[in-house]
């Protein structure tokens, strides 16, 4: 996926405005996600527990250049009837709350203890920040959703979502160099959402 952001809380030199001219920070990013295992699949092996295996995926968010919103994650999801549960480990912005007190990958090497930002490492746009991936503080995130079936008195399929946010919006890299107003801390890491399912490609939501 490709995305482009305009961050008003970060300044950037604007030479067309003359000496000292500034504009808001413009930043593009790329994200990747790969599914490692499919829910209920044992890939040719016949084990009784196969039906209980979850989807497992690994992802990189804003993985190149300045990496202001960079995150990496490993996540699993499993459906039980109308419920769908998700839980994962996140690094970077997703790991900024440090809610497990360290990085489990540090048992392999202490290089995973520290994480630099794209700015601090001097990375240019489009250059993958491999030296930062899966490093630094780590946090657990997760959520659950429930599908509300269509009924005579309720003529749409919809979902209720509950999410635990592992991003510290004051400490995440995209705000460490903020100028002026900073992001306010959240009253709660718990978010609630509601989605109407129009078809398999289109949902409308309120969060």
Residue ranges and their predicted role:
Residues 60-91:
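Hydrophobic, well-structured mid-protein blocks that either form specific transmembrane helices
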Residues 1-64, 80, 93, 148-158, ...:
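Transmembrane beta-barrel domains of Gram-negative outer membranes and organellar outer membranes
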Residues 84-193, 197:
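Outer-membrane beta-barrel transmembrane domain signature
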Residues 200-207:
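Short, intrinsically disordered, charge-balanced linker/junction segments flanking boundaries
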Residues 24-30, 52, 68-72, 136-142, ...:
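Residues that define the transmembrane beta-barrel architecture of outer-membrane proteins
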């Amino acid at each position: 996926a490709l995305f482009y952001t305009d961050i008003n809380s970060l300044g950037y030199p604007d030479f067309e405005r003359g000496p000292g001219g500034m504009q808001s920070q413009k930043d593009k990013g790329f994200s990747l996600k790969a599914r490692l295992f499919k829910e209920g699949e044992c890939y040719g092996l016949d084990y009784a527990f196969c039906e209980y295996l979850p989807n497992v995926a690994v992802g990189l968010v804003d993985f190149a250049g300045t990496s202001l919103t960079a995150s990496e994650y490993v996540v699993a999801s499993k459906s039980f009837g109308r419920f769908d549960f998700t839980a994962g480990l996140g690094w970077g912005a997703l790991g900024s709350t440090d809610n497990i007190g360290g990085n489990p990958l540090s048992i392999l090497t202490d290089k995973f203890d520290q994480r630099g930002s794209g700015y601090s490492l001097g990375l240019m746009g489009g250059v993958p920040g491999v030296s930062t991936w899966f490093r630094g503080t780590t946090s657990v995130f997760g959520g659950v959703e429930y599908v509300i079936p269509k009924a005579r008195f309720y003529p749409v399929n919809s979902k209720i979502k509950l999410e635990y946010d592992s991003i510290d919006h004051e400490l995440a890299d995209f705000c460490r160099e903020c100028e002026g107003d900073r992001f306010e801390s959240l009253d709660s890491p718990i978010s609630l959402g509601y989605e109407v399912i129009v078809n398999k490609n289109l949902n409308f939501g309120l969060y």
